[in-house]
Amino acid sequence: MHGFILFVTYTMKHGTREEFLREVKECGVLEEIRREKGCLGYDYYYPVDKSDELCILEKWEKEEDQIRHLDQPHMDKIKVLKSRYVLDTQMEGIKC
């Protein structure tokens, strides 16, 4: 497989992870992201031993697709939610 994988870790405000995920699902942004050109996968995961962290595994055909994704209008929904619930964001990208 050729492509770009991005592993994102959010440090959440204490006790807000479930509320953040509920709002992400309700606003429909996941479906919009998954329909973007070049998106091969976009999934949330929980670290087993860190209740205030949330991880995203993004899979893209090309790194350029992931960069374009950040400027999509529906990403404004995520930015608003992150401002309410997320303290810090760490990212690690891998070209494969």
Language-model segment annotations:
Residues 13, 71-74, 87:
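Charged, amphipathic alpha-helical interaction segments
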Residues 2-17, 22:
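Short, structured interface segments that constitute the first stable element of a domain
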Residues 4-11, 41-70:
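Short, well-ordered beta-strand segments in beta-rich or mixed alpha/beta enzyme
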Residues 2-5, 40-52, 77-96:
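Glycine-rich beta-strand-turn "strand-cap" elements at beta-sheet edges
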Residues 16-40, 74-77:
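Short amphipathic alpha-helical segments
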